């Protein structure tokens, strides 16, 4: 049901390898996005909010970019994808740029969804306690009015135990559930695999791309943990790993 690869979502050959001829209709992703503001104010914290100096967490690829770098990254990620509907996380700094990029990719911007985390984050002054989700569409939507979703989703943060910007599964489950008129989910910035977890809960096939090898392993390990399924197929550098190697790499002791 799910496909995961370690690759670059801006490379057509990597997208083709992941999708393998399939055409997921939903784009659901959380790209690095506070990075533009961080770079231009000469900060080094990026979208994780605070640097992790203990060496325990892999660095997020593309987390510290200029605004132009962010635009190039998102433009590349939205090029030649089959998706008809898009949910993309962002913040107030990057919203205006993302709006233009999504429209340029052929989506009509339909909604601004607010994730209310319940408590403010770190810092001083007006500390942020929300993130934004842009919803865009290339085709007609068929939302079920009986589900009663509003555009403010109040859900507590996750513990970030797997990824510095890990999103709560419950949050992504609501996005997947409310778009049940579409089939298949593509996430070009896989992170900790929360998109895959939400899709597994709702029976949606998912196609997950992650640039960092360490986080790609995190996604596979998470899938095995939440499903209990150990019959995963793993190919590395063109070689399909035997069952015992997969167990040694991904399964808990």
What are these regions (language model features)?
Residues 1-19, 220-253:
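S-adenosyl-L-methionine
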Residues 2-216:
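Core catalytic lobe of class I
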């Amino acid at each position: 049901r799910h496909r995961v690869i370690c690759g670059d979502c801006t490379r057509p050959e990597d997208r083709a390898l992941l999708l393998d001829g399939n055409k997921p209709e939903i784009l659901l992703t959380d790209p690095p996005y506070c990075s533009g503001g961080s770079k231009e104010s000469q900060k080094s914290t990026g979208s994780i909010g605070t640097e992790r100096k203990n060496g325990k967490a892999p660095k997020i690829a593309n987390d510290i970019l200029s605004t132009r770098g962010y635009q190039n990254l998102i433009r590349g990620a939205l090029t030649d994808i089959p998706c008809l509907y898009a949910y993309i996380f962002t913040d107030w700094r990057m919203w205006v740029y993302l709006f233009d990029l999504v429209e340029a990719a052929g989506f009509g911007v339909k909604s601004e969804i607010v994730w209310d985390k319940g408590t403010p984050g770190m810092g001083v002054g007006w500390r942020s306690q929300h993130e934004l989700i842009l919803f865009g569409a290339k085709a007609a939507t068929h939302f079920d009015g009986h589900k009663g979703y509003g555009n403010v989703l109040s859900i507590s943060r996750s513990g970030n135990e797997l990824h510095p910007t890990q999103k709560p599964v419950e949050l992504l489950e609501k996005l997947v559930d409310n778009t049940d008129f579409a089939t298949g989910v593509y996430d070009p910035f896989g992170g900790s695999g929360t998109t895959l977890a939400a899709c597994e809960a709702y029976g949606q096939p998912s196609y997950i791309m992650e640039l960092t090898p360490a986080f790609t392993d995190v996604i596979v390990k998470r899938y095995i943990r939440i499903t209990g399924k150990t019959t995963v197929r793993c190919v590395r550098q063109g070689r399909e790993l035997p069952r015992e190697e997969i167990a040694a790499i991904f399964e808990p002791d």
